[in-house]
């Protein structure tokens, strides 16, 4: 029994030693960005569903970015006006009501303290006593007098007297501060109401972007339109490609931004947006889509952000509308359905067909592959023409040499005949 107990003890000690030896050491590694962690190799089953692409800009134009761990919050207070304008309406209205209520209560308290310190509360029924504010018999009446003073609605039952210098000074201070509060809060509300963000609601983008041939070149296209009769002045369009990349040194750059040329050098990016327009991007060697084919497009994790800017004709304020397209919203081999028709004396736009597309014959190769095929098709033709020209030149030189030899032979025969005749 003692031996059995000793053997069991040895086994347990050996297991504990093995566990101590085999216990892994926790090594803390730097945390990579989410997209970098997603791109790391992992064992994934074949029936795994495709990972959904996270938008950088939503279809309605709002940026899908949240700022966290912002420690220097005092910076928001240094620009308090913009902070109030950017707040939601419910918070803005709450602050609007609270600011006026607090100022009325604050100055009402001061008016009540002046009356209390002067002893006006003790001589309410004394007709020979001249109070600072007549008929001020408590805090409620002082609060009402503060409202009448700051809103300048006019004095009635309660009036300040000329026997109270401290009341006159407080009246001046409240009048000035009340004007400042009115200017600040009313200005804030006016700016928030007149913001051109709502104007962007009537600037529409097509739900899909398309890739098809235009004038013999592969192009990426999307459509924009304005629903209002008052137009956008100095309208301009630009587009950016949002795609993560890894440099040759191994640096991972999340959400790298690349400009997409939509006519910057030709002036086509400046729009006269009276009717819907199709914005075209030619896929050439400078395009980020140069090597992307139809089969490769669904595998790409990219996002195209389009930005339309201009001035509102009615107010002159700058307006910006945004939208985006991910790979699932880019249709290869499609075109947009025409929406503009000529009626009796005017053009009519059918916005029911604004987002509609139809299929068209488009090669599934990338623009780079199409250019290589075109160059290969031109090489044999140029080679055959040059070879024929070279052969023709060689034949001409050979004929000239033969003619020269025949002429020399004839000249030699004539000379021999002349010598024989002389002899």
UniProtKB/Swiss-Prot annotation:
<comment type="function">
    <text>Inward rectifier potassium channels are characterized by a greater tendency to allow potassium to flow into the cell rather than out of it. Their voltage dependence is regulated by the concentration of extracellular potassium; as external potassium is raised, the voltage range of the channel opening shifts to more positive voltages. The inward rectification is mainly due to the blockage of outward current by internal magnesium. This potassium channel may be involved in the regulation of insulin secretion by glucose and/or neurotransmitters acting through G-protein-coupled receptors.</text>
</comment>
<comment type="subunit">
    <text>Associates with KCNJ3/GIRK1 or KCNJ5/GRIK4 to form a G-protein-activated heteromultimer pore-forming unit. The resulting inward current is much larger. Interacts (via PDZ-binding motif) with SNX27 (via PDZ domain); the interaction is required when endocytosed to prevent degradation in lysosomes and promote recycling to the plasma membrane.</text>
</comment>
<dbReference type="GO" id="GO:0008076">
    <property type="term" value="C:voltage-gated potassium channel complex"/>
</dbReference>
<keyword id="KW-0633">Potassium transport</keyword>
<feature type="topological domain" description="Cytoplasmic">
    <location>
        <begin position="189"/>
        <end position="423"/>
    </location>
</feature>
<dbReference type="InterPro" id="IPR040445">
    <property type="entry name" value="Kir_TM"/>
</dbReference>
<dbReference type="GO" id="GO:0015467">
    <property type="term" value="F:G-protein activated inward rectifier potassium channel activity"/>
</dbReference>
<keyword id="KW-0813">Transport</keyword>
<keyword id="KW-0991">Intellectual disability</keyword>
<feature type="intramembrane region" description="Pore-forming">
    <location>
        <begin position="151"/>
        <end position="157"/>
    </location>
</feature>
<dbReference type="InterPro" id="IPR016449">
    <property type="entry name" value="K_chnl_inward-rec_Kir"/>
</dbReference>
<feature type="transmembrane region" description="Helical; Name=M2">
    <location>
        <begin position="167"/>
        <end position="188"/>
    </location>
</feature>
<dbReference type="InterPro" id="IPR041647">
    <property type="entry name" value="IRK_C"/>
</dbReference>
<keyword id="KW-0407">Ion channel</keyword>
<keyword id="KW-0472">Membrane</keyword>
<dbReference type="GO" id="GO:0034765">
    <property type="term" value="P:regulation of monoatomic ion transmembrane transport"/>
</dbReference>
<feature type="region of interest" description="Disordered">
    <location>
        <begin position="390"/>
        <end position="423"/>
    </location>
</feature>
<dbReference type="GO" id="GO:0005794">
    <property type="term" value="C:Golgi apparatus"/>
</dbReference>
<dbReference type="InterPro" id="IPR003275">
    <property type="entry name" value="K_chnl_inward-rec_Kir3.2"/>
</dbReference>
<dbReference type="InterPro" id="IPR013518">
    <property type="entry name" value="K_chnl_inward-rec_Kir_cyto"/>
</dbReference>
<keyword id="KW-0597">Phosphoprotein</keyword>
<keyword id="KW-0406">Ion transport</keyword>
<comment type="similarity">
    <text>Belongs to the inward rectifier-type potassium channel (TC 1.A.2.1) family. KCNJ6 subfamily.</text>
</comment>
<dbReference type="GO" id="GO:1990573">
    <property type="term" value="P:potassium ion import across plasma membrane"/>
</dbReference>
<keyword id="KW-0851">Voltage-gated channel</keyword>
<feature type="topological domain" description="Cytoplasmic">
    <location>
        <begin position="1"/>
        <end position="89"/>
    </location>
</feature>
<feature type="topological domain" description="Extracellular">
    <location>
        <begin position="115"/>
        <end position="138"/>
    </location>
</feature>
<feature type="intramembrane region" description="Helical; Pore-forming; Name=H5">
    <location>
        <begin position="139"/>
        <end position="150"/>
    </location>
</feature>
<keyword id="KW-0630">Potassium</keyword>
<dbReference type="GO" id="GO:0005242">
    <property type="term" value="F:inward rectifier potassium channel activity"/>
</dbReference>
<dbReference type="Pfam" id="PF17655">
    <property type="entry name" value="IRK_C"/>
</dbReference>
<keyword id="KW-1022">Congenital generalized lipodystrophy</keyword>
<protein>
    <recommendedName>
        <fullName>G protein-activated inward rectifier potassium channel 2</fullName>
    </recommendedName>
</protein>
<feature type="short sequence motif" description="Selectivity filter">
    <location>
        <begin position="152"/>
        <end position="157"/>
    </location>
</feature>
<keyword id="KW-0225">Disease variant</keyword>
<dbReference type="GO" id="GO:0005886">
    <property type="term" value="C:plasma membrane"/>
</dbReference>
<feature type="modified residue" description="Phosphoserine">
    <location>
        <position position="23"/>
    </location>
</feature>
<keyword id="KW-1133">Transmembrane helix</keyword>
<dbReference type="InterPro" id="IPR014756">
    <property type="entry name" value="Ig_E-set"/>
</dbReference>
<dbReference type="Pfam" id="PF01007">
    <property type="entry name" value="IRK"/>
</dbReference>
<keyword id="KW-0812">Transmembrane</keyword>
<feature type="short sequence motif" description="PDZ-binding">
    <location>
        <begin position="420"/>
        <end position="423"/>
    </location>
</feature>
């Amino acid at each position: 029994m003692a031996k059995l107990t000793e053997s069991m003890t040895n086994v347990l000690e050996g297991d504990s030693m093995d566990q101590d030896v085999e216990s892994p050491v926790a090594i803390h590694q730097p945390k990579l960005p989410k997209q970098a962690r997603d791109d790391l190799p992992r064992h994934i089953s074949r029936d795994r569903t495709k990972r959904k692409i996270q938008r950088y800009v939503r279809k309605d134009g709002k940026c899908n970015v949240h700022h966290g761990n912002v420690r220097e919050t005092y910076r928001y207070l240094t620009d308090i006006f913009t902070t109030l304008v950017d707040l939601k309406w419910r918070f803005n209205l709450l602050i609007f009501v609270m600011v006026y209520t607090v100022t009325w209560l604050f100055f009402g308290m001061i008016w009540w303290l002046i009356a209390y310190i002067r002893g006006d509360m003790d001589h309410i029924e004394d007709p020979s006593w001249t109070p600072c504010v007549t008929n001020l018999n408590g805090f409620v009446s002082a609060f009402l007098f503060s409202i009448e003073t700051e809103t300048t609605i006019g004095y009635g039952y309660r009036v300040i007297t000329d026997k109270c210098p401290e009341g006159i000074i407080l009246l001046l201070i409240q009048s000035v501060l009340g004007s400042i509060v009115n200017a600040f809060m009313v200005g804030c509300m006016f700016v928030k109401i007149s913001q051109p963000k709502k104007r962007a609601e009537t600037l529409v983008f097509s739900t899909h972007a398309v890739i098809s041939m235009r004038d013999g070149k592969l192009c990426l296209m999307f459509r924009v339109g304005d629903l209002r009769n008052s137009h956008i002045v100095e309208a301009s369009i630009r587009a950016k490609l949002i795609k993560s990349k890894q440099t040759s040194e191994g640096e991972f750059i999340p959400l790298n931004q690349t400009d997409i040329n939509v006519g910057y050098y030709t002036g086509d990016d400046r729009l006269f947006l009276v009717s819907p327009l199709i914005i075209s991007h030619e896929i050439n060697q400078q395009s980020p889509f140069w090597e992307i084919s139809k089969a490769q497009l669904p595998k790409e994790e990219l996002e195209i952000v389009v930005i339309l800017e201009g001035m509102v004709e009615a107010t002159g304020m700058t307006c910006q509308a945004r939208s985006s397209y991910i790979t699932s919203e880019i249709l290869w081999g499609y075109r947009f359905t025409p929406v503009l028709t000529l009626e009796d004396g005017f053009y009519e736009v059918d916005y029911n067909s604004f987002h509609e597309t139809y299929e068209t014959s488009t090669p599934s190769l990338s623009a780079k592959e199409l250019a290589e095929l075109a160059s290969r098709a031109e090489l044999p033709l140029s080679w055959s023409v040059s070879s024929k020209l070279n052969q023709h030149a060689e034949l001409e030189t050979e004929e000239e040499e033969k003619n020269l030899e025949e002429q020399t032979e004839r000249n030699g025969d004539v000379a021999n005949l002349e010598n024989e005749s002389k002899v």
